[in-house]
Amino acid sequence: VSASDVSNNNTPIDFMSDLNEVYEKFKDGSISIRGHKSMKFINKIPFNIVTENANKLYSTRQGKYGALNPKCFDQTYHIDEYNPLVINNVYNENSYKIIKDYFHSNIDCGNFALGDRQANRYKSNNESFSRLVQYELLPLVEHVLNKKMQPTYIYVSCYTKNQEKDGEERKTELPPHTDRPDCEYTISYIIDKPEGSNWPIYVDKTKQPVKNKGRYWFYPPKENCIPVDGDANSLMMFNGTDHIHYREEMPCDFYYIVLLHFRSVET
C-alpha cells in the first residue's frame, strides 16, 4: 500500500468503511479481483471460492466488533520493543472456523503455491480473503496501541514439514531477519497448528543500529532472545524492524500463519 492509497488530499481514509464496501461488493457481485479502494488484492484463489467465503465471514460479524471476539476489548495491553504481545481467541468462534477451513481446504487442493526463497511454506502476497482478515483486525490493533493504524500488506506463510527438493531435504525454518518499513508492527496470526505443539519465534533483545536491513547471516543467541508463541486463533505482535527474529527447525507437521502488517498513520 503506497502513501497515495492511504490518504488523498490529506483526508484520512476510513479503512473500516472500505471494508464494509468490499463486503457489499462481494454480496452484489461487483467486486474486482484487484480489490477496492485501499484494499488491494493479488488474487490467487479461484474467485468463486473467495466470494463464497467472504460472504460467509460477513454473516458471522457481530456489530461493532465485526469478526473479532468481543472479549479481546475487555482489557488494555502493553507492548513495546522488549515486550512482545500474544492475544488468544482473536476472532469469534464462527469467524475462526471459516478462516481455518478456508486455508486448510485451499492448501489441501493445491490453490496456494509451495515454497519461497525464505522457507518451506505455502505462500501468497496480498491474497484476497486474507486482506479481509487483516482489515477485520484493525480495530483491535488500534485498541492495543491506542493510536490510528493502517493495514499495509499481508503474506500467507503456512509452513509444512520438511520435503525433499532435487534430492535434498529442505528444512522448515525461518532465517534471521529484520522487517521492512511497512511492517512497523508485525502480527503473526496463527491460523492453525497441531494441538500441543510449540514453534516459537525468537525475537532478539538487541536493537540493531540500522532498521529494515533484511536478512542476517547469523543467529542471535537464544539466551538473548524472547520466545513468542500462541495457540491457534491467536496473534503474536512485535516490532521487527530493528530486532532480529527467527525460528529454528519446525518440530511439528504444519504451522499455518498469515502475516498481517500494519504501520502508524502519518499525521
Predicted regions and their residues:
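A structural signal for short, well-ordered beta-strand segments and their strand-loop junctions
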Residues: 86-88, 150-151, 237-238, 259
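Active-site donor-binding loop signature of nucleotide-sugar glycosyltransferases
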Residues: 89, 240, 249, 262
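A short coil-to-beta-strand element that immediately follows conserved catalytic motifs
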Residues: 145-155
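Short proline/glycine-enriched turn/loop segments at secondary-structure junctions
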Residues: 246-252
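Non-heme Fe(II)/2-oxoglutarate
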Residues: 2-145
